[in-house]
Amino acid sequence: ISQTRLGGGRVHHAMRTVGSCKRLLDAMSRRAVSRKTRTGTIADYQSVQMQIADSYIELEQFKLFVLKTAWMIDKHQDYRKVRKDIAAIKALMPKVYHDIAQRCIHIHGSLGVSNEMPFVGNLIGSMVMGIADGPTEVHKVTVAKQHLRAYRDVEDPMFPDYSLIERRARAHEMYDPVEEIVEAAE
């Protein structure tokens, strides 16, 4: 019962993390286009572009996952039915937050680790997210167990239905009668 009640809080933390990551992405983007080098700005370097692209992609993926989970909670009105996705966003949240915070610090250079910027606090916050409300590993186990429930009734462990042997057998069952009809028509 307590795990069910915590679901809303976990989604709320994930939404707040989306906001924090968005601020970090904005900060690193502003720094990239404003930090001058001899030939332009650091935004001109592919390594900086890759870090910004990775941060943008990870943030968008995480944001959409959080929105989907919130939509499913609204749809089902039952946290237990969305337990796997709630656990998944809880497990993913500290990694996304950590990776984006680390990139932001890196793009800011020594300024990023100074007490003039909030980024070290973000990095520490990401580590706290991985421990608070249950360690990430516990949530990953929940995701795996919930996911594997759909695969409990395996018919033949020696030759699963996706093996080439089984697929060929099904193809023969489906198409051999058609071949006989075609041959008879000729």
Predicted regions and their residues:
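Alpha-helical interface subdomain recognition
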Residues: 3-186
